[in-house]
Amino acid sequence: MREVLGCLAVRLAVGRMPEDELSSFEDLFRELLNHPSYEPAEDLLEVDRAFHDLVLRCSGNRWLMDIAGLLLDRSQLIRVISHKHPGRMEESWHEHLGLIEAIRGNDAAAAERWALVHVANARESVIQSIMP
């Protein structure tokens, strides 16, 4: 479900995201990549959620914002497990940077591919964490 909603949100958000917000998140993700041992995890999850909320808001679709936002709320524990998997946070920041680059380039297809990669990698990290 996250794949479908996330890809739709990203596709709709291309061309609608304010450059200043994209730049702020880009700077933040690059800073986090330069300091991979940063903690606490709650702060990192807040950054991740804020970026997802920006994408949803910029989709311009109220229904999508509500449903996908609820899904993100309900999957918080899964997101915590995913982010605790070794190397997942850094991988996630790279995925977000790829998504930003695609959005900035007005490339909806590339943005959608990055969204799919992001969700697939998150799912795989959860599976590896709970079924070692």
Regions found by a protein language model. Name each.
Residues 118-132:
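Short, charge-rich amphipathic alpha-helical segments embedded
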Residues 87-88:
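Hinge/beta->alpha junction and helix N-cap segments in small-molecule ligand-binding domains
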Residues 2-10, 15-81, 93-102, 110-121:
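Conserved amphipathic alpha-helical segments that form helical-bundle/coiled-coil interaction surfaces
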